[in-house]
Regions:
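Bacterial Sec-dependent N-terminal signal peptides
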Residues: 15-34
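Noncatalytic modules at the cell exterior or secretory-pathway interfaces
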Residues: 201-216
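Beta-strand-rich interaction/scaffold domains
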Residues: 136-183
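Surface-exposed, low-complexity/disordered Ser/Thr/Gly/Pro/Asn-rich loops and linkers
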Residues: 64-94
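Short beta-strands within extracellular/lumenal beta-sheet-rich domains
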Residues: 87-103, 191-199, 228-230
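Extended, low-complexity, turn-rich repeat/linker tracts enriched in Gly/Pro/Ser/Thr and Asp/Glu
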Residues: 116-133, 145-146, 220-223
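A short beta-strand element within beta-rich, extracytoplasmic domains
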Residues: 106-123, 214-216
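Short beta-strand-plus-loop segments that form exposed binding edges in beta-rich domains
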Residues: 176-181, 189-196, 213-222
Length: 240
């Protein structure tokens, strides 16, 4: 499967998103989903977790908008903007989308590539941690819809995403959201799952569905605002 994982990511890098490949020689089927937010929101939904349930949510300044990206990154180009003020030192801001028509109860290896705009330079210092290097980008998937729940008086996530720099069963860390040190304003960055040694495996549910999840897990006690511009996900599974 590790070899297959490398093959999948090679396909991402060579720009074959949206295609479907079927290799009869090794019994591996590979297909992909590409989401370009300059064109549409494409049924992605947004939510926030990891903050106290007994606190007025307005204090966290939680915001989502399908809106234009920062002007220096291209005029009239839309993006998914998520923003929040991390008073809890653990805010998770995420997007999710259901994928259908998969084989039921089947394991899939997934590879992720996420492009987003950040304004947090590498080496910057903030309360609780760095605005860039203490905010971790995660990607994952689950056969159960990711939802906000209340647990121990906290708004929590109902699936295991890990915590901050640690991956969980249903999500892996792709890196942080820092941009180069000399950057002024927003810049586009790309993070991918090739940083992980092992492939990410998810099992579809009995209806042949999974939910993709992309988000930031923050240890920086301040405001983080990011603009997601593109998500590519490559699936592979045995065709035997």
């Amino acid at each position: 499967m590790k070899t297959c994982g490398k093959l999948i990511f090679f396909i991402v890098l060579t720009g074959l998103c949206g295609c479907e490949l079927n290799s009869d020689s090794n019994g591996i089927m590979v297909f992909s989903y590409g989401f370009d937010f300059s064109k549409s929101q494409d049924n992605w939904a947004v939510d926030f977790t990891d903050f106290p349930a007994d606190t007025d949510p307005s204090a966290y300044e939680l915001e989502f908008a399908y809106t234009e990206r920062p002007a220096n990154l291209g005029a009239n180009k839309k993006s998914m903007m998520l923003s929040g003020n991390n008073h809890s030192d653990d805010l998770f801001m995420f997007m999710k989308r259901k994928i259908t028509d998969l084989s039921p109860n089947t394991d899939y290896a997934l590879a992720f590539e996420v492009e987003l705009a950040s304004n947090a330079p590498k080496g910057s210092v903030g309360i609780g941690g760095s605005p860039g290097q203490s905010v971790f980008l995660k990607a994952g998937a689950s056969g159960t819809e990711p939802k906000q729940i209340i647990e121990d008086n906290q708004y929590a996530l109902n699936i295991d995403k890990g915590n901050q720099s640690t991956s969980g069963q249903m999500a892996v860390v792709l890196g942080d959201i820092s941009v180069p040190e000399e950057t002024e304003g927003y810049a586009l960055i790309t993070r991918n799952s090739d940083v992980n040694a092992d492939p990410f495996i998810v099992r579809s549910n009995s209806k042949g569905e999974i939910w993709l999840i992309i988000g930031t897990d923050s240890g920086f006690e301040g405001t983080t605002t990011v603009y997601y511009t593109r998500v590519n996900v490559i699936f592979s599974t045995s065709s035997n």
